[in-house]
């Protein structure tokens, strides 16, 4: 429900529904990798689609087969330098262990799904981390910056090398827009490779604070290979974006 209400911009109901899950069976695992390496047995996954190596795994388990850069994987979903280089993603963040560098491609790939040969991993649909970040964004937009910061830090801090010194403080954000921007970047980092990005692009197309404006331009693989493009906190160069993958405005007929 929090996901639906967030798309509807019904901030109060997002918070109300999120509160219903507090203190219940679902929690935020202490290690950000746990929902993926322990996909059958963790307390963070609210809803996942099970896969089995003996049950049509070639189709049902296509997620790991297509995304993984490990042996047997097709590595078709690389991590963009736009995300990898983001100032919001610290270099010692534990979630950087969930991206894998493959030298033959000179590229990083999402490594949440690590069994491309057996393809038995569960497909994550909804995790408690999303509930918390949905609540954080809704609270920020509704004017409750204290609650927003609490929920944002709850998700982010578990991945920090030193939460005591690296956690966000209220003084880090000059206004609501800055806080919401941090929450949106946290979503990109936390849900990389889980299919949440498109929904955010769509719902934020005409946003009052941080409009996506449409489908962002994409970086062309051949434009960054052997260019040293992946640098924590590094720049993202305009020439990396290819003509074949240009920005598509929200008004374009292809934007449904």
Please give the residue ranges for each predicted region.
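Acidic/polar-rich alpha-helix caps and helix-coil junctions
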Residues: 1-63, 87-256
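Short, cationic low-complexity segments
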Residues: 67-83
């Amino acid at each position: 429900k929090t996901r639906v209400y967030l798309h509807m911009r019904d901030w109060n109901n997002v918070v109300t529904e999120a509160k219903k899950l507090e203190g219940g069976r679902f929690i935020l695992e202490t290690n950000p990798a746990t929902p993926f390496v322990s996909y059958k047995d963790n307390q963070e996954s609210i809803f996942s689609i099970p896969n089995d190596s003996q049950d049509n795994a070639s189709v049902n388990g296509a997620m790991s087969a297509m995304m993984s850069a490990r042996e047997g994987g097709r590595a078709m979903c690389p991590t963009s330098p736009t995300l990898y280089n983001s100032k919001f993603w610290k270099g010692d963040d534990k979630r950087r262990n969930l991206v894998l560098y493959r030298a033959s491609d000179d590229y990083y790939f999402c490594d949440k799904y690590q069994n491309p040969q057996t393809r038995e991993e569960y497909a994550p649909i909804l995790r408690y981390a999303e509930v918390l970040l949905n609540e954080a964004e809704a609270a920020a937009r509704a004017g409750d910056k204290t609650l927003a910061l609490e929920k944002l830090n709850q998700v982010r801090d578990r991945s920090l090398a030193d939460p005591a010194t690296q956690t966000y403080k209220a003084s880090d954000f000059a206004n609501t827009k800055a806080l919401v921007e941090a929450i949106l970047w946290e979503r990109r980092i936390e849900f990389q490779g889980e299919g949440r990005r498109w929904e955010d692009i769509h719902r934020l197309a005409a946003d009052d604070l941080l409009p996506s404006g449409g489908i962002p331009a994409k970086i062309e693989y051949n434009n960054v290979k052997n260019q040293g493009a992946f640098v924590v906190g590094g720049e993202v160069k305009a020439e990396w974006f290819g003509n074949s993958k240009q920005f598509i405005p929200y008004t374009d007929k292809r934007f449904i």
